[in-house]
Protein backbone atom coordinates (compact mmCIF):
# COMPACT_ATOMS: atom_id res chain seq x y z
CA UNK A 1 0.00 0.00 0.00
CA UNK A 2 1.30 3.49 -0.88
CA UNK A 3 0.14 6.57 1.01
CA UNK A 4 0.89 9.91 -0.62
CA UNK A 5 1.62 12.49 2.09
CA UNK A 6 0.60 16.02 1.23
CA UNK A 7 -1.41 18.71 3.00
CA UNK A 8 -5.08 17.92 3.19
CA UNK A 9 -5.08 14.58 1.41
CA UNK A 10 -3.82 11.02 1.54
CA UNK A 11 -3.79 8.81 -1.55
CA UNK A 12 -3.41 5.04 -1.36
CA UNK A 13 -2.19 2.70 -4.06
CA UNK A 14 -1.87 -1.06 -4.23
CA UNK A 15 1.75 -1.96 -4.81
CA UNK A 16 3.01 -5.50 -4.87
CA UNK A 17 5.72 -7.77 -6.07
CA UNK A 18 5.34 -10.99 -7.99
CA UNK A 19 5.52 -13.86 -5.54
CA UNK A 20 6.63 -16.07 -8.41
CA UNK A 21 8.56 -15.23 -11.53
CA UNK A 22 10.22 -17.21 -14.28
CA UNK A 23 13.69 -16.48 -12.92
CA UNK A 24 13.25 -16.59 -9.17
CA UNK A 25 10.94 -15.59 -6.35
CA UNK A 26 12.01 -12.10 -5.36
CA UNK A 27 10.70 -8.82 -4.04
CA UNK A 28 10.77 -5.63 -5.96
CA UNK A 29 13.66 -3.79 -4.29
CA UNK A 30 11.99 -0.39 -4.47
CA UNK A 31 9.70 1.77 -6.47
CA UNK A 32 11.06 3.95 -9.24
CA UNK A 33 14.69 4.97 -9.02
CA UNK A 34 16.85 6.77 -11.51
CA UNK A 35 19.00 3.82 -12.47
CA UNK A 36 20.51 2.30 -15.55
CA UNK A 37 20.62 -1.47 -15.74
CA UNK A 38 23.36 -3.32 -17.54
CA UNK A 39 22.36 -3.86 -21.14
CA UNK A 40 22.91 -7.40 -22.31
CA UNK A 41 22.46 -9.05 -25.67
CA UNK A 42 20.32 -12.16 -25.95
CA UNK A 43 21.47 -14.30 -28.86
CA UNK A 44 18.67 -16.45 -30.24
CA UNK A 45 19.70 -19.21 -32.60
CA UNK A 46 17.15 -20.35 -35.14
CA UNK A 47 18.12 -24.00 -35.21
CA UNK A 48 19.72 -24.79 -31.85
CA UNK A 49 16.39 -24.72 -29.96
CA UNK A 50 18.03 -23.03 -26.95
CA UNK A 51 18.30 -19.51 -25.55
CA UNK A 52 19.94 -18.94 -22.16
CA UNK A 53 21.05 -15.94 -20.13
CA UNK A 54 24.73 -15.82 -19.25
CA UNK A 55 26.89 -13.36 -17.39
CA UNK A 56 28.95 -10.89 -19.37
CA UNK A 57 32.16 -12.78 -18.61
CA UNK A 58 30.73 -16.01 -19.97
CA UNK A 59 31.03 -15.09 -23.64
CA UNK A 60 32.34 -18.53 -24.48
CA UNK A 61 28.70 -19.69 -24.46
CA UNK A 62 28.33 -18.31 -27.96
CA UNK A 63 31.28 -20.29 -29.26
CA UNK A 64 29.95 -23.41 -27.57
CA UNK A 65 26.63 -23.06 -29.37
CA UNK A 66 24.43 -21.93 -26.51
CA UNK A 67 22.20 -19.04 -27.48
CA UNK A 68 23.18 -16.78 -24.61
CA UNK A 69 23.50 -13.21 -23.47
CA UNK A 70 26.63 -11.11 -23.86
CA UNK A 71 27.64 -7.80 -22.37
CA UNK A 72 26.84 -5.07 -24.89
CA UNK A 73 30.07 -3.28 -25.76
CA UNK A 74 29.13 -2.32 -29.30
CA UNK A 75 27.48 0.94 -30.33
CA UNK A 76 26.21 -0.84 -33.44
CA UNK A 77 23.68 -2.73 -31.32
CA UNK A 78 21.70 0.38 -30.41
CA UNK A 79 18.97 -0.23 -32.96
CA UNK A 80 17.48 -3.39 -31.45
CA UNK A 81 17.76 -6.92 -32.84
CA UNK A 82 20.32 -7.58 -35.50
CA UNK A 83 20.95 -10.54 -37.75
CA UNK A 84 24.24 -12.34 -37.21
CA UNK A 85 26.35 -14.38 -39.59
CA UNK A 86 25.92 -18.10 -40.00
CA UNK A 87 29.36 -18.98 -38.68
CA UNK A 88 29.11 -17.15 -35.36
CA UNK A 89 27.08 -19.77 -33.51
CA UNK A 90 27.25 -23.54 -33.32
CA UNK A 91 24.80 -25.73 -31.53
CA UNK A 92 25.60 -28.01 -28.61
CA UNK A 93 26.23 -30.95 -30.92
CA UNK A 94 28.81 -29.06 -32.90
CA UNK A 95 26.73 -28.40 -36.01
CA UNK A 96 26.56 -24.85 -37.31
CA UNK A 97 23.35 -22.92 -36.91
CA UNK A 98 22.36 -21.17 -40.10
CA UNK A 99 21.02 -17.90 -38.64
CA UNK A 100 20.35 -16.12 -35.38
CA UNK A 101 19.43 -12.68 -34.13
CA UNK A 102 20.63 -10.61 -31.20
CA UNK A 103 18.10 -8.82 -28.98
CA UNK A 104 18.89 -6.26 -26.24
CA UNK A 105 17.96 -7.51 -22.78
CA UNK A 106 18.03 -6.13 -19.22
CA UNK A 107 17.46 -8.04 -15.98
CA UNK A 108 14.64 -5.86 -14.68
CA UNK A 109 10.91 -6.27 -14.14
CA UNK A 110 7.94 -3.96 -14.60
CA UNK A 111 5.05 -3.86 -12.17
CA UNK A 112 1.92 -2.83 -14.07
CA UNK A 113 0.05 -2.18 -10.80
CA UNK A 114 2.25 0.78 -9.88
CA UNK A 115 0.82 4.30 -9.78
CA UNK A 116 1.06 5.94 -13.18
CA UNK A 117 3.94 8.29 -12.38
CA UNK A 118 6.07 5.45 -11.01
CA UNK A 119 5.23 3.14 -13.90
CA UNK A 120 6.12 5.78 -16.47
CA UNK A 121 9.48 6.40 -14.86
CA UNK A 122 10.24 2.68 -14.74
CA UNK A 123 9.27 2.34 -18.40
CA UNK A 124 11.50 5.24 -19.38
CA UNK A 125 14.39 3.76 -17.38
CA UNK A 126 13.99 0.48 -19.26
CA UNK A 127 13.84 2.22 -22.63
CA UNK A 128 17.08 4.03 -21.85
CA UNK A 129 18.75 0.87 -20.53
CA UNK A 130 17.78 -1.03 -23.69
CA UNK A 131 19.02 1.90 -25.82
CA UNK A 132 15.95 1.81 -28.03
CA UNK A 133 16.58 3.77 -31.20
CA UNK A 134 15.27 7.36 -31.39
CA UNK A 135 14.43 7.28 -27.66
CA UNK A 136 17.99 6.74 -26.43
CA UNK A 137 20.76 9.33 -26.75
CA UNK A 138 18.54 11.67 -28.74
CA UNK A 139 20.28 15.05 -28.95
CA UNK A 140 17.08 16.90 -29.83
CA UNK A 141 14.63 15.20 -27.46
CA UNK A 142 15.36 14.05 -23.93
CA UNK A 143 12.21 12.20 -22.78
CA UNK A 144 10.85 12.84 -19.31
CA UNK A 145 8.30 10.61 -17.64
CA UNK A 146 5.62 13.23 -17.03
CA UNK A 147 5.33 13.94 -20.76
CA UNK A 148 4.93 10.28 -21.66
CA UNK A 149 1.46 8.98 -22.47
CA UNK A 150 0.38 5.38 -21.82
CA UNK A 151 -2.62 3.94 -23.61
CA UNK A 152 -3.70 0.49 -22.47
CA UNK A 153 -4.80 -1.62 -25.41
CA UNK A 154 -7.94 -3.67 -24.93
CA UNK A 155 -8.45 -7.18 -26.23
CA UNK A 156 -5.40 -8.76 -24.58
CA UNK A 157 -6.21 -11.71 -22.35
CA UNK A 158 -2.69 -12.98 -21.59
CA UNK A 159 -0.66 -9.79 -21.11
CA UNK A 160 -1.05 -6.13 -20.21
CA UNK A 161 -0.30 -4.23 -23.42
CA UNK A 162 0.37 -0.50 -23.69
CA UNK A 163 1.06 1.97 -26.42
CA UNK A 164 3.91 4.20 -25.23
CA UNK A 165 3.61 7.67 -26.79
CA UNK A 166 5.89 10.70 -26.67
CA UNK A 167 5.80 13.88 -28.78
CA UNK A 168 7.94 13.62 -31.93
CA UNK A 169 9.17 10.10 -31.08
CA UNK A 170 8.00 6.82 -32.63
CA UNK A 171 5.46 5.07 -30.44
CA UNK A 172 6.37 1.74 -28.84
CA UNK A 173 4.28 -1.28 -27.98
CA UNK A 174 4.97 -2.45 -24.43
CA UNK A 175 3.99 -5.97 -23.47
CA UNK A 176 4.01 -6.88 -19.75
CA UNK A 177 3.50 -10.59 -19.29
CA UNK A 178 0.45 -11.54 -17.29
CA UNK A 179 0.22 -13.62 -14.12
CA UNK A 180 -0.16 -17.40 -14.04
CA UNK A 181 1.75 -17.90 -17.31
CA UNK A 182 4.52 -20.22 -16.17
CA UNK A 183 2.59 -23.27 -17.36
CA UNK A 184 0.93 -21.55 -20.31
CA UNK A 185 3.57 -19.94 -22.53
CA UNK A 186 7.15 -20.99 -23.13
CA UNK A 187 8.75 -17.55 -23.48
CA UNK A 188 12.06 -18.99 -24.69
CA UNK A 189 10.33 -20.82 -27.54
CA UNK A 190 8.28 -17.71 -28.28
CA UNK A 191 11.44 -15.63 -28.67
CA UNK A 192 12.89 -18.23 -31.01
CA UNK A 193 9.75 -18.03 -33.13
CA UNK A 194 9.99 -14.23 -33.18
CA UNK A 195 13.58 -14.60 -34.34
CA UNK A 196 12.53 -16.87 -37.19
CA UNK A 197 9.77 -14.49 -38.19
CA UNK A 198 12.13 -11.52 -38.01
CA UNK A 199 14.48 -13.16 -40.48
CA UNK A 200 11.55 -13.41 -42.88
CA UNK A 201 10.36 -9.86 -42.17
CA UNK A 202 7.12 -11.13 -40.64
CA UNK A 203 5.57 -9.23 -37.77
CA UNK A 204 6.60 -6.08 -35.87
CA UNK A 205 10.25 -5.47 -34.98
CA UNK A 206 11.39 -6.55 -31.52
CA UNK A 207 13.34 -3.74 -29.82
CA UNK A 208 14.30 -5.29 -26.51
CA UNK A 209 13.30 -7.58 -23.67
CA UNK A 210 13.23 -7.49 -19.90
CA UNK A 211 12.41 -10.21 -17.37
CA UNK A 212 8.63 -10.01 -17.60
CA UNK A 213 8.02 -8.33 -20.92
CA UNK A 214 9.35 -6.68 -24.04
CA UNK A 215 9.17 -3.62 -26.30
CA UNK A 216 8.05 -3.97 -29.91
CA UNK A 217 7.44 -1.77 -32.90
CA UNK A 218 4.04 -0.10 -32.77
CA UNK A 219 2.34 -0.23 -36.14
CA UNK A 220 1.20 3.37 -36.52
CA UNK A 221 -2.12 4.10 -38.20
CA UNK A 222 -3.05 0.43 -38.04
CA UNK A 223 -6.64 -0.64 -37.40
CA UNK A 224 -7.50 -3.74 -35.41
CA UNK A 225 -10.19 -5.81 -37.07
CA UNK A 226 -13.55 -6.18 -35.36
CA UNK A 227 -16.02 -9.02 -34.99
CA UNK A 228 -17.86 -7.62 -38.02
CA UNK A 229 -14.73 -7.13 -40.11
CA UNK A 230 -13.84 -10.82 -40.08
CA UNK A 231 -17.34 -11.69 -41.30
CA UNK A 232 -16.93 -9.47 -44.35
CA UNK A 233 -16.97 -11.69 -47.47
CA UNK A 234 -13.79 -10.21 -49.01
CA UNK A 235 -11.99 -9.76 -45.69
CA UNK A 236 -12.52 -13.44 -44.96
CA UNK A 237 -10.94 -14.33 -48.29
CA UNK A 238 -8.00 -12.06 -47.50
CA UNK A 239 -7.51 -13.58 -44.05
CA UNK A 240 -7.50 -17.05 -45.60
CA UNK A 241 -4.84 -16.09 -48.14
CA UNK A 242 -2.65 -14.49 -45.49
CA UNK A 243 -2.95 -17.55 -43.25
CA UNK A 244 -1.91 -19.74 -46.19
CA UNK A 245 1.15 -17.54 -46.73
CA UNK A 246 2.15 -17.98 -43.10
CA UNK A 247 1.56 -21.73 -43.22
CA UNK A 248 3.78 -22.28 -46.24
CA UNK A 249 6.27 -19.48 -45.61
CA UNK A 250 7.83 -20.53 -42.29
CA UNK A 251 9.53 -23.96 -42.36
CA UNK A 252 9.30 -26.14 -39.27
CA UNK A 253 12.34 -27.20 -37.30
CA UNK A 254 13.02 -30.92 -37.25
CA UNK A 255 12.43 -30.91 -33.48
CA UNK A 256 8.98 -29.37 -33.94
CA UNK A 257 7.90 -32.05 -36.35
CA UNK A 258 9.34 -34.75 -34.11
CA UNK A 259 7.48 -33.44 -31.04
CA UNK A 260 4.13 -33.55 -32.79
CA UNK A 261 1.23 -31.12 -32.70
CA UNK A 262 1.80 -28.17 -30.38
CA UNK A 263 -1.84 -28.04 -29.32
CA UNK A 264 -1.83 -31.59 -27.93
CA UNK A 265 1.58 -31.07 -26.34
CA UNK A 266 0.09 -28.17 -24.41
CA UNK A 267 -3.18 -29.95 -23.64
CA UNK A 268 -1.33 -32.93 -22.16
CA UNK A 269 1.00 -30.63 -20.22
CA UNK A 270 -1.90 -28.61 -18.83
CA UNK A 271 -3.87 -31.72 -17.89
CA UNK A 272 -0.87 -32.91 -15.86
CA UNK A 273 -0.52 -29.50 -14.24
CA UNK A 274 -4.18 -29.37 -13.23
CA UNK A 275 -4.13 -32.97 -12.02
CA UNK A 276 -1.33 -32.16 -9.59
CA UNK A 277 -3.62 -29.77 -7.71
CA UNK A 278 -5.30 -32.53 -5.71
CA UNK A 279 -7.58 -30.27 -3.73
CA UNK A 280 -9.07 -28.69 -6.86
CA UNK A 281 -9.32 -31.87 -8.95
CA UNK A 282 -10.70 -33.86 -6.04
CA UNK A 283 -13.71 -31.60 -5.63
CA UNK A 284 -16.43 -32.76 -8.07
CA UNK A 285 -18.02 -29.30 -7.91
CA UNK A 286 -14.96 -27.77 -9.57
CA UNK A 287 -15.06 -30.30 -12.39
CA UNK A 288 -18.81 -29.94 -12.86
CA UNK A 289 -18.76 -26.14 -12.81
CA UNK A 290 -15.62 -25.66 -14.91
CA UNK A 291 -15.57 -28.67 -17.23
CA UNK A 292 -19.26 -29.65 -17.22
CA UNK A 293 -18.35 -33.23 -16.31
CA UNK A 294 -19.11 -35.44 -13.30
CA UNK A 295 -15.53 -35.94 -12.15
CA UNK A 296 -11.93 -35.65 -13.26
CA UNK A 297 -11.48 -39.34 -14.04
CA UNK A 298 -14.41 -39.39 -16.44
CA UNK A 299 -13.24 -36.17 -18.06
CA UNK A 300 -9.77 -37.63 -18.68
CA UNK A 301 -11.27 -40.83 -20.11
CA UNK A 302 -13.37 -38.91 -22.62
CA UNK A 303 -10.49 -36.64 -23.63
CA UNK A 304 -8.39 -39.74 -24.26
CA UNK A 305 -11.22 -41.32 -26.25
CA UNK A 306 -11.55 -38.23 -28.44
CA UNK A 307 -7.79 -37.99 -29.01
CA UNK A 308 -7.56 -41.62 -30.13
CA UNK A 309 -10.55 -41.11 -32.43
CA UNK A 310 -8.96 -37.99 -33.91
CA UNK A 311 -5.65 -39.75 -34.62
CA UNK A 312 -7.50 -42.64 -36.27
CA UNK A 313 -9.31 -40.18 -38.54
CA UNK A 314 -5.91 -38.85 -39.64
CA UNK A 315 -4.62 -42.37 -40.41
CA UNK A 316 -2.21 -42.49 -37.48
CA UNK A 317 0.17 -40.24 -35.58
CA UNK A 318 2.86 -40.51 -38.26
CA UNK A 319 0.50 -38.98 -40.80
CA UNK A 320 -0.46 -36.24 -38.35
CA UNK A 321 3.19 -35.31 -37.85
CA UNK A 322 3.84 -35.45 -41.58
CA UNK A 323 1.11 -32.89 -42.21
CA UNK A 324 2.22 -30.42 -39.53
CA UNK A 325 2.87 -26.84 -40.61
CA UNK A 326 3.78 -23.58 -38.87
CA UNK A 327 0.57 -22.13 -37.39
CA UNK A 328 -0.34 -18.94 -35.55
CA UNK A 329 -2.94 -20.73 -33.38
CA UNK A 330 -4.60 -17.55 -32.11
CA UNK A 331 -5.92 -15.72 -35.19
CA UNK A 332 -8.73 -13.95 -33.38
CA UNK A 333 -9.72 -10.57 -34.77
CA UNK A 334 -7.80 -8.69 -32.07
CA UNK A 335 -4.58 -10.14 -33.52
CA UNK A 336 -5.40 -9.06 -37.08
CA UNK A 337 -4.58 -5.53 -38.24
CA UNK A 338 -5.01 -3.45 -41.35
CA UNK A 339 -1.90 -1.28 -41.62
CA UNK A 340 -3.62 0.92 -44.22
CA UNK A 341 -7.16 1.29 -45.56
CA UNK A 342 -8.27 -1.42 -47.97
CA UNK A 343 -10.06 -0.12 -51.06
CA UNK A 344 -13.50 -1.22 -52.21
CA UNK A 345 -14.18 -3.57 -49.30
CA UNK A 346 -17.63 -3.41 -47.64
CA UNK A 347 -17.52 -2.82 -43.90
CA UNK A 348 -20.01 -5.60 -43.11
CA UNK A 349 -20.61 -9.13 -44.29
CA UNK A 350 -22.73 -9.22 -47.44
CA UNK A 351 -23.77 -12.45 -49.11
CA UNK A 352 -23.41 -12.72 -52.89
CA UNK A 353 -26.25 -11.14 -54.82
CA UNK A 354 -29.02 -13.39 -56.07
CA UNK A 355 -28.47 -11.88 -59.52
CA UNK A 356 -24.94 -13.31 -59.71
CA UNK A 357 -24.23 -15.61 -62.59
CA UNK A 358 -23.66 -19.28 -61.89
CA UNK A 359 -19.99 -20.27 -61.94
CA UNK A 360 -18.80 -22.44 -64.78
CA UNK A 361 -16.51 -24.27 -62.33
CA UNK A 362 -17.58 -27.13 -60.13
CA UNK A 363 -18.65 -25.98 -56.71
CA UNK A 364 -19.48 -27.26 -53.25
CA UNK A 365 -21.75 -24.28 -52.64
CA UNK A 366 -25.47 -24.98 -52.61
CA UNK A 367 -26.97 -24.19 -56.00
CA UNK A 368 -29.26 -21.66 -54.36
CA UNK A 369 -26.33 -19.53 -53.21
CA UNK A 370 -25.38 -18.32 -56.71
CA UNK A 371 -21.76 -17.93 -55.63
CA UNK A 372 -19.22 -17.55 -58.41
CA UNK A 373 -16.34 -19.76 -57.28
CA UNK A 374 -14.04 -18.34 -59.96
CA UNK A 375 -14.29 -14.94 -58.27
CA UNK A 376 -13.02 -16.52 -55.05
CA UNK A 377 -10.16 -18.59 -56.43
CA UNK A 378 -9.08 -15.98 -58.99
CA UNK A 379 -9.36 -12.61 -57.23
CA UNK A 380 -8.49 -9.49 -59.27
CA UNK A 381 -4.85 -8.46 -59.06
CA UNK A 382 -5.83 -5.13 -57.53
CA UNK A 383 -7.70 -6.95 -54.78
CA UNK A 384 -4.90 -9.42 -54.08
CA UNK A 385 -2.25 -6.68 -54.11
CA UNK A 386 -3.83 -5.25 -50.97
CA UNK A 387 -3.35 -8.45 -48.98
CA UNK A 388 -0.08 -7.13 -47.56
CA UNK A 389 -2.07 -4.50 -45.66
CA UNK A 390 -3.43 -7.27 -43.46
CA UNK A 391 -0.95 -8.41 -40.82
CA UNK A 392 -1.19 -10.87 -37.97
CA UNK A 393 0.45 -10.09 -34.62
CA UNK A 394 1.04 -11.82 -31.27
CA UNK A 395 2.71 -15.17 -31.91
CA UNK A 396 2.66 -16.32 -28.27
CA UNK A 397 0.83 -19.55 -29.11
CA UNK A 398 2.44 -20.20 -32.50
CA UNK A 399 3.86 -23.61 -33.29
CA UNK A 400 3.49 -26.78 -35.31
CA UNK A 401 -0.08 -27.93 -35.90
CA UNK A 402 -2.26 -29.24 -38.71
CA UNK A 403 -3.70 -26.48 -40.89
CA UNK A 404 -7.19 -27.63 -39.89
CA UNK A 405 -6.50 -26.74 -36.25
CA UNK A 406 -5.40 -23.18 -37.06
CA UNK A 407 -8.32 -22.64 -39.41
CA UNK A 408 -10.80 -24.13 -36.92
CA UNK A 409 -9.45 -21.76 -34.28
CA UNK A 410 -10.00 -18.71 -36.48
CA UNK A 411 -13.51 -19.78 -37.47
CA UNK A 412 -14.35 -20.43 -33.81
CA UNK A 413 -13.41 -16.83 -33.00
CA UNK A 414 -16.38 -15.68 -35.07
CA UNK A 415 -18.51 -16.63 -32.04
CA UNK A 416 -17.00 -13.98 -29.74
CA UNK A 417 -17.42 -10.28 -29.07
CA UNK A 418 -14.49 -9.36 -26.84
CA UNK A 419 -15.50 -5.69 -26.88
CA UNK A 420 -18.86 -6.43 -25.30
CA UNK A 421 -18.85 -4.44 -22.08
CA UNK A 422 -21.13 -6.84 -20.19
CA UNK A 423 -20.02 -10.33 -21.24
CA UNK A 424 -16.85 -10.38 -23.39
CA UNK A 425 -16.30 -14.02 -22.39
CA UNK A 426 -19.57 -15.29 -23.81
CA UNK A 427 -19.67 -17.75 -26.71
CA UNK A 428 -22.44 -17.10 -29.24
CA UNK A 429 -22.79 -20.44 -31.02
CA UNK A 430 -25.27 -19.00 -33.51
CA UNK A 431 -22.51 -16.75 -34.89
CA UNK A 432 -20.30 -19.61 -36.03
CA UNK A 433 -19.87 -19.22 -39.82
CA UNK A 434 -22.44 -21.04 -41.91
CA UNK A 435 -21.59 -23.41 -44.75
CA UNK A 436 -21.31 -20.66 -47.37
CA UNK A 437 -19.02 -18.56 -45.18
CA UNK A 438 -16.76 -21.51 -44.41
CA UNK A 439 -16.57 -22.47 -48.09
CA UNK A 440 -15.75 -18.88 -49.06
CA UNK A 441 -12.88 -19.00 -46.58
CA UNK A 442 -11.66 -22.46 -47.62
CA UNK A 443 -11.78 -21.91 -51.39
CA UNK A 444 -9.62 -18.81 -50.83
CA UNK A 445 -7.22 -20.72 -48.60
CA UNK A 446 -6.86 -23.82 -50.78
CA UNK A 447 -6.54 -21.98 -54.10
CA UNK A 448 -3.86 -19.56 -52.87
CA UNK A 449 -0.22 -20.61 -53.42
CA UNK A 450 -1.45 -23.99 -54.57
CA UNK A 451 1.46 -24.67 -56.88
CA UNK A 452 1.24 -27.90 -58.81
CA UNK A 453 -1.28 -29.64 -56.58
CA UNK A 454 -2.78 -32.65 -58.36
CA UNK A 455 -5.82 -33.07 -56.13
CA UNK A 456 -8.92 -31.36 -57.57
CA UNK A 457 -9.66 -28.20 -55.63
CA UNK A 458 -13.16 -29.34 -54.66
CA UNK A 459 -11.77 -32.53 -53.14
CA UNK A 460 -9.16 -30.62 -51.16
CA UNK A 461 -11.75 -28.15 -49.87
CA UNK A 462 -14.07 -31.01 -48.94
CA UNK A 463 -11.31 -32.83 -47.09
CA UNK A 464 -10.26 -29.70 -45.20
CA UNK A 465 -13.88 -28.86 -44.33
CA UNK A 466 -14.21 -32.28 -42.70
CA UNK A 467 -10.87 -32.01 -40.92
CA UNK A 468 -11.78 -28.62 -39.45
CA UNK A 469 -14.90 -30.09 -37.86
CA UNK A 470 -12.85 -32.98 -36.43
CA UNK A 471 -10.15 -30.69 -34.98
CA UNK A 472 -12.62 -28.09 -33.72
CA UNK A 473 -13.14 -29.85 -30.35
CA UNK A 474 -9.36 -29.68 -29.82
CA UNK A 475 -9.55 -25.90 -30.15
CA UNK A 476 -12.28 -25.68 -27.52
CA UNK A 477 -10.47 -28.05 -25.14
CA UNK A 478 -7.22 -26.10 -25.51
CA UNK A 479 -8.73 -22.74 -24.58
CA UNK A 480 -10.88 -24.21 -21.81
CA UNK A 481 -7.81 -25.60 -20.02
CA UNK A 482 -5.94 -22.38 -20.77
CA UNK A 483 -8.70 -20.41 -19.06
CA UNK A 484 -8.53 -22.52 -15.90
CA UNK A 485 -4.79 -21.95 -15.61
CA UNK A 486 -4.99 -18.28 -16.57
CA UNK A 487 -7.69 -17.63 -13.97
CA UNK A 488 -5.29 -18.24 -11.10
CA UNK A 489 -7.83 -20.46 -9.33
CA UNK A 490 -5.23 -23.23 -8.99
CA UNK A 491 -2.62 -20.98 -7.40
CA UNK A 492 -1.86 -21.57 -3.75
CA UNK A 493 -2.13 -18.58 -1.47
CA UNK A 494 1.24 -17.64 0.00
CA UNK A 495 1.76 -16.06 3.37
CA UNK A 496 2.10 -12.30 3.24
CA UNK A 497 5.27 -10.71 4.58
CA UNK A 498 4.65 -6.99 4.23
CA UNK A 499 7.48 -4.44 4.25
CA UNK A 500 6.86 -0.78 5.07
CA UNK A 501 9.21 2.04 4.09
CA UNK A 502 9.32 5.67 2.98
CA UNK A 503 10.40 6.94 -0.44
CA UNK A 504 10.39 10.18 -2.37
CA UNK A 505 8.45 9.86 -5.62
CA UNK A 506 9.38 11.32 -9.02
CA UNK A 507 7.22 14.39 -8.27
CA UNK A 508 9.00 15.11 -4.99
CA UNK A 509 6.16 13.94 -2.77
CA UNK A 510 6.73 11.67 0.20
CA UNK A 511 5.24 8.16 0.02
CA UNK A 512 4.74 5.53 2.70
CA UNK A 513 5.01 2.18 0.94
CA UNK A 514 3.75 -1.16 2.14
CA UNK A 515 4.92 -3.90 -0.23
CA UNK A 516 3.25 -7.29 -0.10
CA UNK A 517 2.70 -10.27 -2.40
CA UNK A 518 0.05 -9.93 -5.08
CA UNK A 519 -2.90 -12.23 -5.52
CA UNK A 520 -4.04 -12.94 -9.07
CA UNK A 521 -6.99 -10.62 -8.55
CA UNK A 522 -4.68 -7.74 -7.61
CA UNK A 523 -2.39 -7.95 -10.58
CA UNK A 524 -2.39 -5.29 -13.24
CA UNK A 525 -4.52 -2.65 -11.60
CA UNK A 526 -5.72 -0.05 -14.09
CA UNK A 527 -3.45 3.00 -14.16
CA UNK A 528 -3.16 4.11 -17.75
CA UNK A 529 -3.80 7.66 -18.87
CA UNK A 530 -6.74 6.93 -21.14
CA UNK A 531 -9.88 4.89 -20.44
CA UNK A 532 -10.05 1.33 -21.71
CA UNK A 533 -12.98 -0.35 -23.44
CA UNK A 534 -13.66 -4.02 -23.98
CA UNK A 535 -11.94 -7.07 -22.61
CA UNK A 536 -9.13 -6.58 -20.10
CA UNK A 537 -6.73 -8.97 -18.43
CA UNK A 538 -7.81 -7.35 -15.15
CA UNK A 539 -11.52 -8.09 -15.37
CA UNK A 540 -11.98 -10.91 -17.89
CA UNK A 541 -13.99 -13.85 -16.53
CA UNK A 542 -11.67 -16.69 -17.49
CA UNK A 543 -13.70 -19.39 -15.79
CA UNK A 544 -16.91 -18.42 -17.59
CA UNK A 545 -14.98 -18.25 -20.86
CA UNK A 546 -13.56 -21.72 -20.30
CA UNK A 547 -16.98 -23.09 -19.37
CA UNK A 548 -18.45 -21.83 -22.66
CA UNK A 549 -15.52 -23.33 -24.56
CA UNK A 550 -15.95 -26.75 -23.00
CA UNK A 551 -19.69 -26.56 -23.71
CA UNK A 552 -18.85 -26.41 -27.43
CA UNK A 553 -16.36 -29.27 -26.95
CA UNK A 554 -19.07 -31.54 -25.53
CA UNK A 555 -21.58 -30.53 -28.19
CA UNK A 556 -19.13 -31.38 -30.96
CA UNK A 557 -18.28 -34.75 -29.41
CA UNK A 558 -21.95 -35.66 -29.30
CA UNK A 559 -22.46 -34.44 -32.86
CA UNK A 560 -19.51 -36.50 -34.07
CA UNK A 561 -20.80 -39.61 -32.31
CA UNK A 562 -17.79 -39.92 -29.98
CA UNK A 563 -19.97 -39.80 -26.86
CA UNK A 564 -23.70 -40.11 -26.25
CA UNK A 565 -26.14 -37.84 -24.48
CA UNK A 566 -26.63 -40.52 -21.82
CA UNK A 567 -22.97 -40.19 -20.77
CA UNK A 568 -23.39 -36.51 -19.98
CA UNK A 569 -24.74 -35.01 -16.79
CA UNK A 570 -24.83 -31.39 -17.94
CA UNK A 571 -26.34 -31.91 -21.38
CA UNK A 572 -28.55 -28.82 -21.11
CA UNK A 573 -25.46 -26.59 -20.82
CA UNK A 574 -23.83 -27.83 -24.03
CA UNK A 575 -23.53 -25.72 -27.18
CA UNK A 576 -24.04 -27.42 -30.54
CA UNK A 577 -22.51 -26.49 -33.89
CA UNK A 578 -23.09 -28.13 -37.25
CA UNK A 579 -20.99 -31.31 -37.43
CA UNK A 580 -22.21 -32.57 -40.81
CA UNK A 581 -19.61 -33.09 -43.52
CA UNK A 582 -19.99 -32.07 -47.16
UniProtKB/Swiss-Prot annotation:
Modified residues (Phosphoserine): 30, 48, 51, 85
Disulfide bonds: none
GO cellular-component term (any): cytoplasm
Superkingdom per UniProt: Eukaryota
Region named Disordered: 1-36
Keywords: ATP-binding, Cytoplasm, Kinase, Lipid biosynthesis, Lipid metabolism, Nucleotide-binding, Phospholipid biosynthesis, Phospholipid metabolism, Phosphoprotein, Transferase
Keyword Oxidoreductase assigned: no
A GO molecular-function annotation: ethanolamine kinase activity
Cellular location(s): Cytoplasm
InterPro entries on file: Choline_kin_N, Kinase-like_dom_sf
GO BP annotations listed: phosphatidylcholine biosynthetic process; phosphatidylethanolamine biosynthetic process
UniProt effect for mutating residue 85 to A: No phosphorylation by PKA, and strong decrease in activity
Coiled-coil annotated spans: none
Primary enzyme class: transferase
Quaternary structure (record): Monomer. Interacts with NAP1.
Anything else known: Present with 3930 molecules/cell in log phase SD medium.
Task performed by this protein: Catalyzes the committed step in the synthesis of phosphatidylcholine by the CDP-choline pathway. Also exhibits ethanolamine kinase activity but it is a poor substrate at 14% efficiency compared with choline.
Protein's recorded name: Choline kinase
Organism: Saccharomyces cerevisiae (strain ATCC 204508 / S288c)
Amino acid sequence: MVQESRPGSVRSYSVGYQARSRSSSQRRHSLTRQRSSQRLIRTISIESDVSNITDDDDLRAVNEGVAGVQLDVSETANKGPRRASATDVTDSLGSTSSEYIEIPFVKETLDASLPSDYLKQDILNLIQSLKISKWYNNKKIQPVAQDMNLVKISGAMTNAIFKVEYPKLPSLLLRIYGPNIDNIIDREYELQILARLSLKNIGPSLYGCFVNGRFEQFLENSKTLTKDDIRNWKNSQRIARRMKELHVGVPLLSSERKNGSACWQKINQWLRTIEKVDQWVGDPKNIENSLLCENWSKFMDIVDRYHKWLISQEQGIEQVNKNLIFCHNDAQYGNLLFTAPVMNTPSLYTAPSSTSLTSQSSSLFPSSSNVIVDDIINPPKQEQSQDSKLVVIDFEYAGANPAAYDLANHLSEWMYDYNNAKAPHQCHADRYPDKEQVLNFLYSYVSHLRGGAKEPIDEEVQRLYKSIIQWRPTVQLFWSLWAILQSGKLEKKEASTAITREEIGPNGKKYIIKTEPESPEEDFVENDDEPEAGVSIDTFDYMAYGRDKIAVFWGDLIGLGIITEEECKNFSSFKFLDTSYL
